[in-house]
Amino acid sequence: MAGSGEGRGWLYKIGGGGAVVAVGTFAHAALPTWLAAACMGLGGLAVVFGSCEAMIKSVEGIGKRVGWNPFVAGTMAGLASNVPELVMLGFVLAAAPRVGFIVTCLTLHVGALAFGLYSGFLPRDATGHARLPDALVKISSDLFAAAAGVFLGTGLIMLMLRAFGAGDHGGEGLGVADLYVLGGALLFVQVVATLELVKRFSGSEEEEAHVGPPPEPPPSWATIAGFGLIGLATSVLGGHAVGDFADVLVESLDAAGYPEMVGALLLSVFASAGAFAMIVTSHRQKLYDVALASAAGQVSQVPFVVLPVALLLLAVLAQTGIITTSSGAVLPIDLETTSVMLLGLPPMLLLWKAVQDDGQ
């Protein structure tokens, strides 16, 4: 893989974006509300893009050190790119738990759209099929199918609880214990899938004869750790800034009388900024398998990383009193929360079928 030591554009993105965020943070009293919010949003996105480039450099180095192929390295980078999204969602969940949950589920559709669009640019053979890495066909497609079952099953359970007034909270919603159990189970699926990915598919799929000058030696572990720490730390800063922008956006739309689903749709796009940055940056550096892994991970990691972490955060916020509940139900069961779960089924099934067909 190339590019781990080339260019300092990521530093300029982090520095410039951080400066814009600082303006929005410390000069907000002297600026119009919309301008301060725009500084937080745009500056935060720039920082997120820079942090993703730093994390790509880190996983590239790890891949060279331990012999990972580009797809596995890209999957690990995709996992790291969830950090700004989770930071942003944490602020939204604390302020508006119901909206935060809806935004989390809607990011699945944004990710599915990005994966579908990016897959359309992949080269195809005479039969019209694209060459897909074995890990995508055998691991990611299993996650797509499992996610379809999770969304359908959870949505139906919520529907039945509400219809029959069942459960500890009379069908009004899911409690702390429910969120812990569901979130923990979903997160365990991702842990197992990641271990299987590294165990079965981390090596090169095909050996290629090296032609030309000898490859550059891999970076030191200290350099790898430095890129990783910078990427993670700045992704938290960027996610925090985008989260502040999201709060202003939700409040403004609510004050203007727009339905909350409009704000949720817009927030789902901003929540996916880290994954988009990873895809664009990897593709621009001609790391196509890394970009494909990031695009696929943006879909498969929503139900098994982002959603369970959001559920666990809701449980923790409720237990610590940050979220107040009258009946003990933390996540309400209503039309919107149930429908976003049930509507997660179609894109998962479509992607599972599409990947299976191209992987034959």
Regions found by a protein language model. Name each.
Residues 1-360:
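Hydrophobic alpha-helical segments, chiefly the membrane-spanning helices
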